[in-house]
């Protein structure tokens, strides 16, 4: 087997090879990827970025899943995923698939499999795509090569879906809980796919932490490029939450990659009815479709990314409370002397006015670095939309990557339509929080729910937000079940996780502190832990 490009202590030569590979793979408008068909939906190879969602009903409730699939399709989503945690659910999905194909024949169905390889083998016979998680696929035995053969015979595609919170013990032991571990987890399976001549493969590298997510996808693109692989990518931020905050967080992570032409299909995971995810995803893809359709090279300023795979704050001088090691500020937060510094040029404002704001901002920073200019940088852009959600998602998709990469010291969002400054300031703070640059409020990490969810997730999240939103800087996770729950909330201070029907386990950090308590007592018990 080929030696991994990654190692726990990667030397400078390997890092430089990966950096060059990333730059080469993203040199054009869009990363080149092969075409993969998921049922009748073609992704990769220049096809428009596809949007998708996942049902949140028990898969054995076939009528509810069929109805929900119809609502997703009506909203514009042609790829729909269902959870198949056991053979009973696999058989239920077979029934669902037959009816969905009768009613909506252009809809592709994806089976989501964790822990039980035998289920993956079963659904490969009728699903348009099978999703497996390398972190738990072999926990109970099973041959990956045999699954590939079943997919080959049926025409099913395969998604190798890596989750930051559920890496295998082997990968955690070799690389730690890191983007490197995520990438090597995927590459191990991709090398088998190539060896077996199976190329109907899609990969995802999801995390609830946008920095980790972006770094993992970038490193995967580079690692695949070095090994001559061009598989398409499915993008998403896990456990993004709900409402405007959830949409902003998804736009920050997904937009950071689409800005560099990376991504072939996306999901905006929201703790809301799944059909709500489709217009949110369409807003992101439309924003970048408009940019890439315009004239221009769309890839200048890459030199600003000195370290694409890890956070590295750009070195700037401090002027009052901005620049240096200070957290990024909003334009409206500048004090009188700092505002004077803005007007007399001691603070640089880089305003993007063209269709490619990330490119404009990066180019300007490259010029400043070349000139030895270490003034603090405030990024500025004016948006025409009068719709608050649209403005927020566009701004998040543009500004987020700049703060994920540590390239700016301040943010300035203007609205040509007269959106109140209080609203644009609130959006700016949410962007900074989503990009991990500055915490200004409680952060809620919550999964969208699926057929494994063990309680009324959306209602519970609403109550948790109502009672705990005043705890600035605290991260609280509300998770539907134990499959991704404990892992994907590893970044949280406290967690509320479904353990069994009507039962909740509470976590402090990564440790369970109250197990299997009645749901009606769980929120009060969580508050008592704080």
Name every feature range the model reports, one short phrase each.
Residues 45-64, 83-85, 107-115, 135, ...:
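Active-site mouth loops of central-metabolism enzymes
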Residues 56, 74-100, 134-139, 201-210, ...:
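Glycine-rich, proline-tolerant flexible connector loops at the mouths of alpha/beta enzymes
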Residues 106-110, 114-159:
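Hydrophobic or amphipathic alpha-helical targeting/insertion segments
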Residues 8-53, 152-153, 290-334, 462, ...:
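N-terminal amphipathic alpha-helix/helix-capping segment at the start of soluble metabolic enzymes
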Residues 59-71, 115-121, 186, 250-254, ...:
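Short, acidic/polar
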Residues 51, 112, 160, 203, ...:
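Conserved, mostly hydrophobic/aromatic
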Residues 163, 171-313, 345-471, 475-478:
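Catalytic alpha/beta core domains of metabolic enzymes, predominantly
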Residues 87-111, 147-156, 220-229, 368-372, ...:
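Alpha-helix-loop-beta-strand connector modules within alpha/beta enzyme cores
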